């Protein structure tokens, strides 16, 4: 008789999880369709990433995207996969991608009620050296009764109904944030399904790791450099923080989520508005952080409170464990006190409901 003991027979897959949440909400099923289609794209990208060398997908395609990054062959493939799968979900009306100058308006016969902003392959500069890369996405509900347009994507992050990222590393992990929490799913290649491995994830109140590209230190605001020095040489003689930086936002943020600490990509003299894009990098990751009990700020305001004016808008980013971010803001506010009043320290807003709650209405 065959021993099936090593195999779990009642596994919680992402599809099952979404269907259960949809049943609880009594929803229409559109969000389920959208997430299932997005997962199919992520599985295909995961496979392409692992076969890139054999399939000759490494290298540069000979062009740059709208934000000035050199476009890699995997970028193009990933972008096409996400766009085509989201179109075929019949759940979206507007798509915003890092790779496209303008928003993509879905054909009338395929339209649904959701707006999706995404970076199909974050950290693509790391492709050739095999470092971890990822896909980032944020999902909004269309709020106007007009014909779909680019303006439908210009919503603050507080309006997100779901957001998350896929990390293509030693395994493929999908982190999905909704109003009811943050859940992590790992791709099991043997059955081709994402399996729930961490439910209702919470970030530590305080970590011991900071993540920033110190190569830009000479162009940083003095408050940034002061904070970094305090992490290296604590004034109270406590243990210094460890420095970790991959250069792929998804990889650096996921480590911060798992271990606690702080991730910084601040503005500098060369990039006074920051470098990361608000709609498809900052907002989705900030949403994940807040739903996990952390904080995400520009230094001057919560990232999720920014009302965007254009789809490729940039923003500074400081996010992570609550106590670490608050410590940064104390230093930042003190440094700026001469020119403006100090800002109140934000509190964790993980339990606040956005305008539209995925667990209340969406499926």
UniProtKB/Swiss-Prot annotation:
Task performed by this protein: Catalyzes the hydrolysis of fructose 1,6-bisphosphate to fructose 6-phosphate in the presence of divalent cations, acting as a rate-limiting enzyme in gluconeogenesis. Plays a role in regulating glucose sensing and insulin secretion of pancreatic beta-cells. Appears to modulate glycerol gluconeogenesis in liver. Important regulator of appetite and adiposity; increased expression of the protein in liver after nutrient excess increases circulating satiety hormones and reduces appetite-stimulating neuropeptides and thus seems to provide a feedback mechanism to limit weight gain.
Sites of the modification N6-succinyllysine? 151
Q: Which pathway does this chain act in?
A: Carbohydrate biosynthesis; gluconeogenesis
Q: Which reaction is the catalytic activity of this chain?
A: beta-D-fructose 1,6-bisphosphate + H2O = beta-D-fructose 6-phosphate + phosphate
At which positions is Mg(2+) 2 bound? 98, 119, 121
Which InterPro entries has this protein been placed in? FBPase_C_dom, FBPase_class-1, FBPase_N, FBPtase, Fructose_bisphosphatase_AS
Supply the enzyme class, top level. hydrolase
Q: According to the UniProt entry, what is the EC number of this protein? A: 3.1.3.11
Key word Metal-binding present: yes
Q: What is this protein called?
A: Fructose-1,6-bisphosphatase 1
Q: Its encoding gene is what?
A: Fbp1
Q: Which family does it belong to?
A: Belongs to the FBPase class 1 family.
As to how many cofactors bind and how, the note says:
Binds 3 Mg(2+) ions per subunit.
- Domain of life of the organism in this record? Eukaryota
Task: State whether it acts alone or in a complex, and with which partners, per the record.
Answer: Homotetramer.
Activity: how regulated? Subject to complex allosteric regulation. The enzyme can assume an active R-state, or an inactive T-state. Intermediate conformations may exist. AMP acts as an allosteric inhibitor. AMP binding affects the turnover of bound substrate and not the affinity for substrate. Fructose 2,6-bisphosphate acts as a competitive inhibitor. Fructose 2,6-bisphosphate and AMP have synergistic effects.
Known cofactor(s) = Mg(2+)
Q: Where does AMP bind?
A: 18-22, 28-32, 113-114, 141
Q: Which GO terms describe its cellular component?
A: cytoplasm; cytosol; extracellular space; nucleus
Entry-linked Gene3D superfamilies: 3.40.190.80, Fructose-1,6-Bisphosphatase, subunit A, domain 1
Q: Report residues binding Mg(2+) 1.
A: 69, 98
PTM-bearing positions, type Phosphotyrosine: 216, 245, 265
Q: Entry's HAMAP family?
A: FBPase_class1
Q: Quote the record's binding site residues for Mg(2+) 3.
A: 119, 122, 281
Species this protein is from: Rattus norvegicus (Rat)
> What terms describe the molecular function in GO for this protein?
AMP binding; fructose 1,6-bisphosphate 1-phosphatase activity; identical protein binding; metal ion binding; monosaccharide binding; RNA polymerase II-specific DNA-binding transcription factor binding
